[in-house]
């Protein structure tokens, strides 16, 4: 499952790379209780109006009420799935492309490494190409908050940096690290998929092989939160494409949101460092309150009907994981929902969901 573009490597070279990562969870998901498995309780009263929330799910898939072209919808209240709806032909086992929601998973992988003492966000990133110039001052925190100061163009409608990186480069992080410094580190916020791929390259450098890196991500993050068959795609160089290319089910995206809702703890086990979620939700100083550490924030009230403490993973074309701590909610919406002529009304959807509590 998944694909890698043929760039700077032959098909024979890529097919010769075999990564032996054991992804067998050792249990059957359909007969294992939520959240580690897919056996969902239908009798737990969380205090939400289930009839109303499921009416909203039906209206969402109607297309004409909230707009957009949604593919999947999952709502957790107090950790329990209370609504789930899919477009015909899709279902709970369908894996959906994350696009930039993958950046938030990169945050989580970094968090696990930091909990284990392998990385320090206050330290310089240590990129070899930067060691003899001002870029040597860029810290992991600057990269996580997208305040590296590196020149970057994230315009998807042109031959931009992001399009060149994703579709024309065999080693995406190498392309990103060559960008010159445009602003002093920590002083300017610039949304950059290049930054996320620099981070995944630094993560890869913590291991002695590609296989060890992939196994670490699976064993210490994904499997720990019940995600057993997600695919984190790699570029031809072997680095995880931490900016854009993760495939997972809607339930798995909900599990990921639940990890953050529960302050980095899942099933009673601490996965992320204590204080990591608070750090993640702290606005980057130059972001005007809209961005934390590879998560979007609602401090600037982009979604006025939602509480200010809401934060989210967001991907191209409207892939969303909304996390609402004060309402004990996780809302997953996947699909094709950002067309200018038919954008999904996420604020209206959130408003109506909140009315059901």
Regions picked out by a protein language model, each given a short descriptive name:
Residues 79, 96-120, 143, 199-203, ...:
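Active-site SXXK
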Residues 1-91, 145, 356-357:
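N-terminal leader/targeting segments and the immediately adjacent pre-domain N-terminus
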Residues 64-72, 87-118, 122-131, 184-191, ...:
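Short active-site loop at a secondary-structure junction
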Residues 227-234, 281-330:
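Active-site Gly/Thr loop motif
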Residues 115-151, 178-180, 208-244:
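Active-site helix/loop module of the DD-peptidase/beta-lactamase fold
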Residues 51-52, 59, 80-85, 159-185, ...:
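Short, charged, amphipathic alpha-helices and their helix-cap/turn boundaries
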Residues 107, 195-203, 244-265, 319-335:
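Active-site-proximal alpha-helical segments within enzyme catalytic domains
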Residues 131-160, 165-187, 194-197, 248-251, ...:
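Conserved catalytic neighborhood of penicillin-recognizing serine enzymes
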